[in-house]
Amino acid sequence: MTTTHTPLPPPPALVPMTQVFCQVGPLVTLGPGPHGERRYVPLGGGTVKGPELNGTLVEGGVDWQINRADGVLDIAAHYVIRADDGALIEVRSEGLRHGPAEVMARLARGEVVLPAEYYFRTVVRFTTGAPQWGHLNKLLAIAVGQREASLVKLDFYRLA
């Protein structure tokens, strides 16, 4: 193996997959922990629509969060998509949401905040036993999020 550095190859392409619109319940705070305030948000139903995946969200998912001392929200969401053909697809996503303190305060109050004003990104993995969706078990996706008062919108992009 040579240790000579060479130029990096072009980055992988991001291919639009789907948009997820998820209803969210009220925030539940569990109190402080060693890494910050522990909390969760129950996930309700929603819609999934896009060029590669369409369906609905199965009610009952959860968005686990740690509100860190540095103002970053550490997110770990777990939910299920029911594809239009009835197949169930488990979704796990982990990521971060942060921005200037005044922007995050507006989000917390349920005000409309433009997505460009804060950072909301997750890495997404899928698991399914449905043969027609088996390719999802072998890929990673990135989601760009937008939070509203009672709704989260996620734009999923498959890493090619």
Segment roles from a protein language model:
Residues 2-160:
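Beta-strand-enriched cores of mature, soluble protein domains
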